[in-house]
Amino acid sequence: MGYLSCKAGSAVAIAVSSAASTSGSTSSKASAPPESPIEDRPRLRRFLHRDLESATGGFDINNLLGRGSHGSVYKAVIGSRHIAVKRPSKSREISREFHNEFEILSRIRSPRFVNLLGFSADNSKEPLLVVEFMGNGSLYDVIHSDTVLNSGAISSWSKRIKIALQIAKAVHLLHSQETPIIHRDIKSANVLMDKNLNAKLGDFGLAIRCNVDDQKVKSTPPAGTMGYLDPDYVTADRLSTKTDVFSFGILLLEIISGRKAIDVRYSPSFIVDWAIPMIKRGKIGGIYDPRIGPPIDVSVRNHLGLVAAKCVRTCREKRPGMEEVVGWLTGLTKSVRSRRWDELSIGNPCMMVETVGGRPVE
């Protein structure tokens, strides 16, 4: 059906032969946290289109979970298991992104991703993807719904920092592959919450598996979502893993503040234009979600905001890598539990000129 890859040698055909070969894996050389291993070429199940169509009630709108960048997602039950079925839109460009998601997710699996479980590829029918069912919707819904807030999903800073850490680990896993994967569309709507309110990164339609010097990168137009898109990523040759770091920084500000990336009800409407000046003026407590107030521990309050500020630096070379971000957030989770600060040091020789309460924002 098609290929989409940065290197011809690593391309995966969306065909029956692809699924048949999934059990023969080669281990990745990339390092990953032991609690979030990546499985290379996971085993996939091939479904009949008619079975998936029936399981969704004929793609009944009552089973519609949401619409993504390249199709719709429906709830279904196969046997006793809840699954989600992704159905592509009819646009050729959308179909290409849909196939790209298959190419990426058919090769990796992790507890930090919304994993691919199977597919249907009947010649006379549209292709369908079967992914894990996430019972608590998207992080966007969690953050921006008072109903969910009241249920306790993000009612404490320990829970919010845990969610941020889980997302950071997901992005780090992508970047640490032997051939890095750049997601290009990290946002709260693409982070889904499972039944235990663990965060998983999904929607890999815009992702690219390649080294930044590959010709494929240089010929792929910039893409992403307004509000999360790296301002440095204006031409194809400016794509790098730091593009994802910027988007993660926006998402972290969203988790911290409870505000949307862009919200026209406020001035300034862009979350960076509002939050970063407050951090520079030493008013970091003012960026925290007023529904639960800032963290009690002043060190946690300051350092969490500083991590976000580092990620959204205009100069991409001064942004941290996701491995650093994972380390900082891991320290913060420990500090929130112990209410003391001794695990995190975010010193960096690339220092910004602004200060927080008289100290540099590094």
From Swiss-Prot:
Enzyme class: transferase
Chain positions found as Phosphoserine: 219
Biased composition regions of type Low complexity, renumbered to the chain: 21-32
Residues bearing the modification Phosphothreonine: 220, 225
Signal peptide: 1-24
Residues annotated for ATP binding in this entry: 65-73, 86
Pfam families tied to this protein: Pkinase (PF00069)
Chief location: secreted
Active site residues of this protein: 185
Stretches the record annotates as Disordered: 21-43
Domain Protein kinase: 59-329
Keyword Kinase appears in the UniProt entry: yes
Localization terms from the record: Secreted
Statement: the UniProt record of this protein carries the keyword Transferase: yes
Chain positions found as Phosphotyrosine: 233
Catalysed reactions listed for this entry: L-seryl-[protein] + ATP = O-phospho-L-seryl-[protein] + ADP + H(+); L-threonyl-[protein] + ATP = O-phospho-L-threonyl-[protein] + ADP + H(+)
GO MF, one example: ATP binding
InterPro entries: Kinase-like_dom_sf (IPR011009), Prot_kinase_dom (IPR000719), Protein_kinase_ATP_BS (IPR017441), Ser/Thr_kinase_AS (IPR008271)
GO cellular component, one term: extracellular region
Superkingdom per UniProt: Eukaryota
Glycosites: 136
PANTHER family in the record: PROTEIN KINASE DOMAIN-CONTAINING PROTEIN (PTHR46146:SF23), SERINE/THREONINE-PROTEIN KINASE-LIKE PROTEIN CCR4 (PTHR46146)
Protein name as annotated: Serine/threonine-protein kinase-like protein At3g51990
Species, as recorded: Arabidopsis thaliana
Organism placement in taxonomy: Eukaryota, Viridiplantae, Streptophyta, Embryophyta, Tracheophyta
